[in-house]
From Swiss-Prot:
Ubiquitin is encoded by 16 different genes. Ubiquitin is generally synthesized as a polyubiquitin precursor with tandem head to tail repeats. Often, there are one to three additional amino acids after the last repeat, removed in the mature protein. Alternatively, ubiquitin extension protein is synthesized as a single copy of ubiquitin fused to a ribosomal protein (either eL40 or eS31) or to a ubiquitin-related protein (either RUB1 or RUB2). Following translation, extension protein is cleaved from ubiquitin. The gene is RPL40B. SUPFAM superfamilies: Ubiquitin-like (SSF54236), Zn-binding ribosomal proteins (SSF57829). This is Ubiquitin-ribosomal protein eL40y fusion protein. GO terms for biological process: protein ubiquitination; translation. Keywords: Cytoplasm, Isopeptide bond, Nucleus, Ribonucleoprotein, Ribosomal protein. The lineage of its organism: Eukaryota, Viridiplantae, Streptophyta, Embryophyta, Tracheophyta. GO terms for cellular component: cytosol; nucleus; ribonucleoprotein complex; ribosome.
């Protein structure tokens, strides 16, 4: 039978499957067509996320049904060089003593009107 898989970009993929096929098999077919690894795929049908070990028949997926493909978001650790860059970007600032505006490291006067473009600046305190 034929089913459709719709991605978040609006692209529709057509797959040839059997009702006895597992969700794992469907994800493998999507990988063959689109190159998306199965561990990054989440399939949704009738508002439910489909579990890998179950079959299409378990979810009452019939011919010409449409599944929705969502990519799994993975959290993780930031690379050390990017961490240093982010820390440098966020900590190398000057602070206005009157209005507490964050300014670039070589600032001489504040850019805000509310403090009268004060020249009373201090370096931002470093995080321990």
């Amino acid at each position: 039978m034929q089913i459709f898989v719709k991605t978040l970009t609006g692209k529709t993929i057509t797959l040839e499957v059997e009702s006895s096929d597992t969700i794992d098999n469907v994800k493998a077919k999507i990988q063959d067509k689109e190159g998306i690894p199965p561990d990054q795929q989440r399939l949704i049908f009738a508002g439910k996320q489909l579990e890998d070990g179950r079959t299409l028949a378990d979810y009452n997926i019939q011919k010409e049904s449409t599944l929705h493909l969502v990519l799994r978001l993975r959290g993780g650790i930031i690379e050390p060089s990017l961490m240093m860059l982010a820390r440098k970007y966020n900590q190398d600032k000057m602070i206005c003593r009157k209005c507490y505006a964050r300014l670039h490291p070589r600032a001489v006067n504040c850019r805000k009107k509310k403090c009268g473009h004060s020249n009373q600046l201090r370096p931002k305190k470093k995080i321990k």
